[in-house]
């Protein structure tokens, strides 16, 4: 294990995603009010229009992954975003907003805690690979695929076959693979399958990927955003195959988390989610 290798973390879940979208919608509302007052210069007007297009696209994508009862329009998110700004500006820990709950530093389990220091995002723990890292969420009857003695073609087909047999809902796929006889990685993937009336299934969302070495140490970690969705079943297989190919490139050093993240995110054209530092590591 190399001490100076860092994990790559990319966004962290539905609460943070909703909070970000709603907050940006609040910013858009402020831009529009300035525009109504003719207080925006030309660059400001350009930013307004670009932000609006970006939000409309992101909300449309995000709503696909939400139950119908939780889907919100841009107008609804603007109202929540403005309230969130008030929470931020006035630091009112009692004004909880859906998707944006105050966080008590002293007692994370207590939402309403008088005389506490409040922060909206807790301090980020150390980023070294030997930090304690929870495995992806437990799933009933997870599938384990052992690929130690298979060539690439057969292994890819086996992954595809296993994926096809999954029921709808969350799944956990454990892939074990020897890499140039140097190390065997245990790869845990959490995702969500959708089942359609015609019987077809598709991998709709990739939530998390962890890779561990033979000693159980974390080698690579990817936490995917809610809107990193897969459009169809073929894309789901392509992503899993891409992961397998990356792990099969084997070299004597542990795989860097940033490399793993790039391999996954590039399937979605989402490389921009990595910071320049992460991309270079």
UniProtKB/Swiss-Prot annotation:
GO cellular component: host cell cytoplasm; host cell nucleus
InterPro entries documented for this protein: NS1, uS15_NS1_RNA-bd_sf
Keyword hit for RNA-binding: yes
Main location class: host cell
One of the Pfam families matching this protein, by short name: Flu_B_NS1
Ranges where the record places region G1P2-binding: 1-103
Region RNA-binding and homodimerization, residue ranges: 1-93
UniProt GO molecular function: protein serine/threonine kinase inhibitor activity; RNA binding
Keyword Lipid biosynthesis: no
Subcellular location: Host cytoplasm; Host nucleus
Physiological role: Binds and inhibits the conjugation of the ubiquitin-like G1P2/ISG15 protein to its target proteins. Since G1P2/ISG15 is an early antiviral protein, NS1 may inhibit the host antiviral response. Prevents EIF2AK2/PKR activation, either by binding double strand RNA or by interacting directly with EIF2AK2/PKR. Also binds poly(A) and U6 snRNA.
Membership in a protein family: Belongs to the influenza B viruses NS1 family.
Listed name of the protein: Non-structural protein 1
